[in-house]
Each structure stands twice: as structure tokens, then as C-alpha cells.
Amino acid sequence: MRKLLNTLFVNSEDLYLSLDNENVAAWKGNEILQRIPLMNLENILYFGYKGASPALLGACVKRHIGFCFLTPQGKFLARAQGLTAGNVLLRKEQYRISEEEPRGLVIARTMIAGKILNSRTVLMRFLRDHPLSVDVTSFQAVIQDLQDSAREAAKADSLDHLRGIEGNAAVSYFSLFDALILNDKKHFYFHGRNKRPPLDRVNALLSFAYTLLAHDCASAIEAAGMDSYIGILHRDRPGRQSLALDLMEELRSVYADRFVLSLVNNRVIPAKCFQLMEDGVVLLNAEGRKTFLSKWQERKKETLTHPFLGEKIYWGLIPYVQALLLARYIRGDLDGYPPFIWK
């Protein structure tokens, strides 16, 4: 269990939660492992199936503490919430921001600047770790270009302008992506992004990773009390969780791209784990999906220090922390939305 931003994250699948006076009691078998005072909490995010006592749920509802149930993999299941206007006011403000471009632009700028800076960091780290495997001049040029793009994004005067900056930065970043692949270049190569459908193994891996990341971001947004279908940078479309796509932008390179590269460069998923369809589409087969999902869950359990909070957390909690920070900004509790910028 971990408490961040007045939110209790329960990651251990074998814990059962109950009410102990004015505390949340975490039980493992017949033993209480920890007690957390309810008075210090705004939300409880429970990743597991053991559940919680009706008395605890009732106490949370009475105190306007949101209790969110998710699967161990992070899929949103349900949210217990009492008769409170908190979520209504949060969502109404979210809807206003989505309709007022100047306000939405303030958030979108930080998200895209964060995305570009993270892409730059991925390239800088690779250049540092593999200086003899790449064209140093090309890397340095793109790294500088991304730095300039991040500055430009922070000053964009419209959402369309920002989308153009983001698109150009993505082209620059992906122009070097093939150089980041170090093993089995016969089967694993990157000649450009293709996604609907993927036409090579690397794009198949990227598309699957982005799908999982978008799913995690959507669950995080719902858990934070916002509407995942009302976006800021991504325009609203029926059935599209636009805010999840917004939130995942800053996480694509450091969360999904690095994960895909680790699978390929460490030979975790070989070429035989793909189906090559007659129409040229390339998909992961059952064995490949099983390996991918297993490693994805392992990666989510690795730790890092959150750049804004300065505390160690699991990688898998990053979308949830960012969603909570975004909700706090929308409520007016923060002066600005702090994007996740990997160091």
C-alpha cells in the first residue's frame, strides 16, 4: 500500500480492507498489516479482487472519499461515491476547459512539451549508452531539434499550431527509431509509423503497447473522477476516450517505446511470435501476446522517483498520479498541470 496525493494505492492483491474505528485496516489473512486514518484520504484505489467491507465503503461514502475498484492489471471496474457534488463540479469544469480553447491550450502545451522532452531524453540516453552504434551527428541534430520544438510547443498560440509542432517533432523522433533497434534487424526494423493496421513487427509491438497505455490512462482518468471521453488536444469522437489519449502523450516514449525496445533488444519476443497475414498486416500471435502482457505487468512493478512528487512509486502508477494531478489542476488546487518529465 502507498499513500500519495491523499490517495491510498492498494497494489497487493492479497489484501482485504476493513474499517477499524476511524482507520482503513489492511488485512493479510488474520493479521492487520497497516492502518491509515480516513481523515487524511480523498481517494482509495484498490487493485485486486479481495475487496473491502461494507462498513468501510459506507464510511468512505459518508466522508466523501472515493473508493475505486480496478483489476490487478489496472482495468477500471467501479467507483463507490456518496452524494457529493465533488465529481460533478470537477467534470463540469473539465467540460468548460474542453470548450474554451485558451484554457485547454494551457494544459495541452505542457503535455506536448513534456512529450517532446521525454522523446529527447530517450534519444539522449541511447546516445550515451551506445555511442559506437549510432550516427552521433544525426542524433545530436535531432536532439537539438526536439529541444527547440519543446520550447515552441510551450508558446504555441492555438491547438492547431500545437498539433503541427507535435507532428513535426514526432517525425524527427521516429526518424531515428530504427537506429534504436540493435538486434535481429532482418525481422525487426522501423521504416516509419504505420498503425491501422501495423505492417511490420515493430509497429505491431508499438500499437499493442499504445493500446495498453491508453487503457491504463483511461482507467486512471475515471478513477480520478474525470470523463475520459472529453479531451483537450484530441477532438471528441463517438467512442474515443480523447482525454486518455491526451494524458498518454507525455508517456508514449518513456513508457511504451522504451518497453518495446527492451523486448526487441533483449530478444524477449522473437520473430516467430508474429502472424504475417496475406494482406501484409503483422500481428502478435497468442504466444507473443502472452509474453508481452507478462513483461508489461513486470515493468509496471518497477520503481522510479516521480519528478514532481520526489517520491518513489511504481511505473504502473504513473498514469494514476498524472490523472490525479490533472484533476487537482482543474479543481484549482494547483497553479499548473505538472507533466511527467523523465529524468
Summary of predicted features, one role per range:
Residues 1-74, 82:
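Terminal-proximal segments
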Residues 1-20, 29, 35, 89-343:
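Active-site helix-to-loop segments that bind/position phosphate- or nucleotide-bearing substrates
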Residues 48-121:
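A surface-exposed, charged beta-strand/loop segment in the N-terminal or early-internal portion
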